[in-house]
UniProtKB/Swiss-Prot annotation:
Organism this protein belongs to: Cronobacter sakazakii (strain ATCC BAA-894) (Enterobacter sakazakii)
Pfam families: Hydrolase_3
Organism phylogeny: Bacteria, Pseudomonadati, Pseudomonadota, Gammaproteobacteria, Enterobacterales
Xref: PANTHER family: HMP-PP PHOSPHATASE, PTHR47267
Swiss-Prot/TrEMBL catalytic activity: 4-amino-2-methyl-5-(diphosphooxymethyl)pyrimidine + H2O = 4-amino-2-methyl-5-(phosphooxymethyl)pyrimidine + phosphate + H(+)
Name this polypeptide is given: HMP-PP phosphatase
Family: Belongs to the HAD-like hydrolase superfamily. Cof family.
Catalytic site positions: D8 (nucleophile)
Matching InterPro entries: Cof, HAD-like_sf, HAD-SF_hydro_IIB, HAD_sf, HMP-PP_phosphatase
GO molecular function annotation: 4-amino-5-hydroxymethyl-2-methylpyrimidine diphosphatase activity; magnesium ion binding; phosphatase activity
Entries under SUPFAM superfamilies matching the protein: HAD-like (SSF56784)
Cofactor section: Mg(2+)
Ligand binding (Mg(2+)): D8, D10, D212
EC number, UniProt record: 3.6.1.-
Length: 272
């Protein structure tokens, strides 16, 4: 019996239009009523996730910034990790010869010098917005993470350069095909879920986790029950071939799985 459920947002709980479907909301409420502790593990900002939780009236722990922050439902900060100022400085002021736009996250919000309203489509449900900022003048301390947004091929080239420059000073991963993130070393959703489970006195064997992207890899591999979305990144499927694959986020596959698990816990699950 799972005691802790960890859920990625984009490509997992959220549908392609970045909305949280009614079936998914109902399934999450049922899971909570059954006594399972909920945790949303996402690259999204704490401020945005709090707005989302208010909309669905659900109590949950928040793992935000891809594991750089953990908050209790009460709002208490349980864990925080930032990029070192040296790494933030190197990324912000380095010349990377890339077409990718640059986005910086700290506790105040989402900062960028790229005014592209299309980026807000993914945040329409919450109303979360970026703040236009001269990133070259931004202090390098207290930076949670830095993201690059571009097509996947351009980001693959950039990833090689970042890894060569930063080495073990940062954790670099794809949170989507078009988003490459620079995080503090050792920071990922899996490490954050381990820290949260220890805080709650729950073993990782009693955790189930759902995800679709490479920033979910550690969380899915460490959870007692890791479930991969049918729309997952090919790299994730290749790296975790032993984990079960459920349906597509467009069909609210997490809700489908949870409903089966709640109603028929002893029967094998089929995505169809």
């Amino acid at each position: 019996m799972a005691r802790l459920g960890a859920f990625d947002m984009d490509g997992t709980l959220l549908m392609p239009d970045h909305q949280l479907g009614e079936a998914t909301q109902m399934a999450l409420h049922r899971l909570h009523q059954r006594g399972v502790t909920l945790a949303f593990a996402t690259g999204r900002h704490l401020l945005e996730m709090r707005q989302m939780l208010q909309k669905i009236a659900l109590e949950a722990f928040l793992i935000t910034g891809n594991g750089t922050r953990i908050h209790a439902p009460s709002g208490e900060l349980l864990f925080a990790e930032d990029l070192s100022p040296q790494v933030a400085e190197a990324v912000l002021h380095g010349y990377w010869d890339t077409s990718a736009s640059l986005h910086v996250f700290n506790d105040s919000g989402w900062l960028t010098d790229n005014d592209d309203p299309a980026l807000l489509d993914a945040h329409a449900w919450s109303g979360f917005r970026y703040q236009l900022t001269d990133l070259k003048r931004l202090p390098a301390h207290q930076v949670t993470k830095i993201c690059f947004v571009a097509d996947h091929d351009a980001l693959c080239e950039l990833r090689v350069k970042l890894c060569q420059t930063l080495g073990s000073q940062a954790h670099i991963c794809f949170s989507a095909l078009d988003c490459l993130e620079v995080l503090p070393p050792g920071c990922n959703k899996g490490a954050a879920l381990q820290a949260l489970s220890q805080h709650l006195g729950i073993t990782m064997a009693d955790c189930m986790a759902f995800g679709d992207a490479m920033n979910d890899r550690e969380m899915l591999s460490l959870a007692g029950k890791g479930l991969i979305m049918g729309n997952a990144m090919p790299q994730l499927l290749a790296e975790l071939p032993h984990l079960p694959v459920i349906g597509h986020c467009s069909r609210q596959a997490v809700a489908h799985y949870l409903t089966h698990w709640l109603d028929h816990p002893h029967l094998d699950y089929s995505p169809e």
